[in-house]
Amino acid sequence: MTNVVVSGEQLQEAFREVAVMVDSTVAITAGPRGKTVGINKPYGAPEITKDGYKVMKGIKPEKPLHAAITSIFAQSCFQCNDKVGDGTTTCSILTSNMIMEALKSIAAGNDRVSIKNGMQKAKDAVLEGITSMSRTIPLEKMDEVAQVAIISANGDKDIGNSIADAVKKVGKEGVITVEESKGSKELEVELTTGMQFDRGYLSPYFITSNEKMIVEFDDPYLLITEKKLSIIQPLLPILEAVVKSGKPLLIIAEDIEGEALSTLVINKLRGGLKVTAVKAPGFGDRRKEMLEDIAALTGAKYVIKDELGIKMEDLTLEDLGTAKNVKVTKDNTTIVSGSSDSDRVKARVEQIKSQIETSTSDYDKEKLRERLAKLSGGVAVLKVGGVTEVEVKERRDRVEDALHATRAAIEEGIVPGGGVALLYASSALDKLKGGSDEEQIGINIIKKVLSAPIKRLVKNAGLESAVIIDHLTKQNDKELIYNVEAMNYANAFTAGVIDPAKVVRIAFETAISVASVLITTESMIVDVPNKEENASSSMGAGGMGGMNGF
C-alpha cells in the first residue's frame, strides 16, 4: 500500500460523485412507493431490500478515495439509526444534497468556511421550526402510536398495532424488548417480569452480535455483588460450574477491572465461557437497594457482600439468579422474565411504598418511584415468529426499527410526515440573514435542501413535485401533507402520515454535521495498492485486474 494525498478539484469531484451515488442509490427506497435495491453478497443470492440502512451498508466503491468518503457518509447515517432506529434514508438525502449544492458554490469561487458557517447558522432556526410543529402523544391515543410504528415498519399494520399494545401494557416509561419466537405465530405481545437499568457492558469484546453491537443471552445465570472485582482467583470455582452447566453468565458488580476483567474477556473470546459484565446501577445506599431489587427479581439467594461473610469461592449455582433473557448494550442492561420469588418481590414493593410515604425529600421520593416502577411495571416482550429463519430475522429487524421510532415519538412528539415537516421548517429561514454574502449562500443552501425529502418521495411515486410543493406552501396549513400512497392532499394527523419529531431532528442535525465536515475538507490521505500488489491481485483473480486510480 502507498499513501496518496488527494486535494483540490480532484477531491471535490470525488465528493460530488459519492454524493450523487448515495442520492441515486439510497434515496430511491424512500417512502411507501420507494423502489427496492439488490445488494450482492459474498455468498448466496443477492439481498433485495428497500431498507435505506441496509442499502447504505451495501455501498462499497472500488476506488479507495470514494470508499473512504462513502464510509464517512455511512457512519454518520448509522449514528442516526443508532440513536433513533430510523431516518437513515432522510439523512442520506439531506447530506448528499447539501454537499452537491455547496460544491457548486465553492466551484464558483465562494469561501467554503463561510458557507459552512451559514449552514450552521440556519441549523438552529430550522430546529426551532421542527419543535414548534411537534405535538405530544397522549397515552390514550394508541392509534397515533400505532401509526408511527406502521410507517417505520414499511406499512405493516400488525407490527404497529402490536407495539401500541405493548406501550399500553407497560406505559410510556415501560421497558419493551424484542425476541425471536420458536413458534410460527408471526407476532405476539407477552407481559412478563423484568427490569432495565442504565449500565452497559464493560468491554466491547463481550458483544455477541457485531451487527447490533449488543450482548444477548438466553437463560443466563446472574452473579450479583456489591464488591469490586479485580482478582480472578476467587471467581474460578463458580465460573467453572457455569461452564459445565453450558449456560451464559451476567456479572453485576460495583466494578470489574484488572486481571478479573481481562481474564473474563480472554475466556469469552476463546469460546470457553459465555459471559458479560456490567457495573451495578445507582450510587451509595441506592446502589445497594437496587442490587437487592435485582436479586429479588431474578431469584438470586442473596447479593454477595462483605457483611454476610460469604466468600466468592464458596458460591454454587443455586446461589445465583436466573433470567429468561438478558440484553446488554453499551448504555443499558435489560433483564427479562427473571425467575423471581413473587413473595420477595411483593415485600420489596410494599417496603418501597412505605418509604415513599415517610420520605420528606422530593428527590428521594422520585428515585423510590423509579425503583417501584422497575419492580412492578414488568417488561413487554414482542415475540417475533415466522416460517423460515430468514423471514424471522427480516421481520425482527423491522419490529426493532419500528420500536425505536415509536420511542422517539413518545419522547419528543410527532410532526406531519411525508417530508413536509422539513419543508415547512424552511420558512424559519425566510428572514434569517448571514453575516456576509457567502454566509447567506450557506443559509440559502439549507433552505433549498429542506425540500429534497418531499421531492424524492413524490418522484419515487412517479409524480411531479413542483406543483405539489407549490400547493402545500401556499395553503398556510402546516398540518397539510400530500399522501403519496393515496395520491391526495390530507391532514397529516387524520391520515396518519406522521413522523417522530426526534427522527426528523436527528436526521437533519446529522446531515448538516457531516456535510459541514466534508465541504471544508481540503485534502485526504488514502491508501492505494502499489503496482506489485495490483499485479499480484490481477494474477490471483484470473486476470480480472485490481483497483486502479483513486
From Swiss-Prot:
HAMAP family the record matches: CH60
Pfam families, per the entry: Cpn60_TCP1
EC number: 5.6.1.7
Protein name as catalogued: Chaperonin GroEL
InterPro entries (alphabetical): Chaperonin_Cpn60_CS, Cpn60/GroEL, Cpn60/GroEL/TCP-1, GroEL-like_apical_dom_sf, GROEL-like_equatorial_sf, TCP-1-like_intermed_sf
Residues binding ATP: 29-32, 50, 86-90, 418, 499
Keyword ATP-binding in record: yes
MF terms in GO: ATP binding; ATP-dependent protein folding chaperone; isomerase activity; unfolded protein binding
Protein purpose: Together with its co-chaperonin GroES, plays an essential role in assisting protein folding. The GroEL-GroES system forms a nano-cage that allows encapsulation of the non-native substrate proteins and provides a physical environment optimized to promote and accelerate protein folding.
Main enzyme class: isomerase
Compartment(s) of residence: Cytoplasm
Gene Ontology cellular component terms for the protein in this record: cytoplasm
Oligomer and partners: Forms a cylinder of 14 subunits composed of two heptameric rings stacked back-to-back. Interacts with the co-chaperonin GroES.
Keyword Isomerase: yes
Gene3D superfamilies for the chain: GroEL, GroEL-like equatorial domain, TCP-1-like chaperonin intermediate domain
GO BP annotation list: protein refolding
Family, as annotated: Belongs to the chaperonin (HSP60) family.
Catalytic reaction list: ATP + H2O + a folded polypeptide = ADP + phosphate + an unfolded polypeptide
Keyword annotations from UniProtKB, A to Z: ATP-binding, Chaperone, Cytoplasm, Isomerase, Nucleotide-binding
